[in-house]
């Protein structure tokens, strides 16, 4: 999704701006954690000030890719009611099967499902409207249709430039891109959906089931 929005001429994109704060606050030993902390902002108040300030480079749209679990409980949520929110979801089995390729022992709070539904409920209550929800499978099966619907939902004009982009990494990718974005860097468009053949390890089945309820709640609101 970041590639789609980042390829628009009118959009500036930012990649997981709370990641350095999250790693610094939790002490999580993620790959290249020291580099992420050194290159990023670790004060969540300053991060919010940046995200709610002027859009860089004179652009009209500020696309902010967030990970729900990076917004730890200490982070003030009120700023979220002043921005346009959209939620991207994915089947828990596919999330976990993908995650364990890089880190083999995630905990429930590492996967973001519980935080995602908490933030969704907060935003929905504050703005008195349901923010758009996209399911990753729907996006891959029909990217043009889903992105048209998303643009309509957030009040911007759809651009064909959202459907294809040059390969490679971007200046706006996080400092962790070399570790996490190898497959993304190869893409030039949305790849067709293919069910994951990877299996959820037996010791993570219980966590997977805990993720199912918030995922299915959000799935009810998805654009399709």
Please report, for each region that a protein language model flagged, where it lies by residue.
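PAPS-dependent sulfotransferase catalytic core
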Residues: 1-57
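Generic structural signal for helix capping and beta-alpha/helix-loop junctions
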Residues: 21-23, 95, 168
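A polyampholytic, Gly/Pro-enriched intrinsically disordered region
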Residues: 33-42, 107-111, 177-189
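Soluble or luminal CAZymes and related metallo-dependent hydrolases
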Residues: 39-46, 67-68, 108-115, 142, ...
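A generic fold-level signal
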Residues: 56-58, 80-81
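Short N-terminal targeting/anchoring amphipathic segment
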Residues: 57-65
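PAPS-dependent sulfotransferase catalytic domain
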Residues: 64-161, 175, 179-182
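PAPS-dependent sulfotransferases, especially Golgi type II membrane carbohydrate sulfotransferases
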Residues: 157-224
